Every structure is written in C-alpha cells, then in structure tokens.
C-alpha cells in the first residue's frame, strides 16, 4: 500500500484531514503536516519525522498545495536525501477531490509514481465551472453538482 503525506501552507493539511475523514472515514495510511509559518528547516524536520513513521508502506506520495512553495520544496529535498531508503514522490496542486481519489486508490498501486500519474487526469477533471444552459426550460436537473 502507498502511504500519503499531505502538507501545505497554514492549516491546509489539517483542513483536508477533517474533510477526508468526513467523506471517507479515518485513513490510517494518510498523515498531515501543516506549515504554520515556522522556518523551512523546522517544517523539513516535521515532514522527516512523519516520513519516519511511514516506513512500512511500499512508498509515499507527498501531496502539497503549491508547486515551488516551502512544503513542496522541503518534500523534494527529503525525496532526494532518502532515495536509497524510501520511495517518495512529491505532487503539488492538491485539492480535496484529488486527496479523496488518492486515499481510495492507494491500495491498488504498488509505486507512488504510478498512483501520482493515475491521479493527474482525476485532478484536472475535478475542476469545473458551472454554466447555466439556456433554451431548455423544462430541464431543471442540475446533475451531481447541486
């Protein structure tokens, strides 16, 4: 099974944690690390300590909020430093639909990169803009989005 570690600015990670628990229940393979404004080095220590608790997994997919942000950069540093001991992949642009898909599919994939690659179309498809269709007043069905 793939382990998941979520990190982002402010309470991004714990906010997603509460939403994920509400939608999918407790996910034992998923850990959350917030970046509350401490130094980048302190965040790196927190992420490293969390990764240390996840060594039983086949690999770890780290899900962060912003590409190039401190949680992303420190996770990439740890990926490179631990390449010989732990398989770690790092992904940015995380949102709730992506996390939900990762959590429900983490047991299907053997490598975190395979899970990450499978999630890219899911992430893109989760972004939608509501458009009111005109010309069909009899159709009051708003689909699954309302």
What are the residue ranges of the model-derived segments?
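N-terminal loops that bind phosphate or other acidic moieties
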Residues: 1-146
């Amino acid at each position: 099974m793939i382990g998941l570690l979520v990190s982002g600015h402010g309470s991004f990670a714990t906010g997603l944690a509460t939403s994920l628990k509400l939608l999918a229940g407790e996910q034992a393979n998923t850990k959350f690390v917030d970046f509350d404004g401490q130094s980048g080095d302190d965040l790196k220590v927190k992420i490293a300590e969390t990764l240390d608790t996840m060594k039983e997994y086949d690999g770890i997919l780290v899900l962060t909020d912003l590409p190039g942000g401190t949680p992303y950069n420190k996770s990439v540093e740890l990926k490179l430093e631990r390449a010989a001991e732990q398989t770690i992949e790092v992904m940015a642009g995380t949102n709730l639909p992506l996390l939900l898909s990762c959590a429900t599919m983490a047991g299907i994939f053997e490598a975190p990169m395979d899970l990450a690659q499978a999630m890219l179309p899911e992430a893109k498809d989760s972004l939608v803009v509501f458009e009111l269709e005109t010309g069909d007043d009899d159709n009051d069905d708003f689909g699954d989005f309302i």
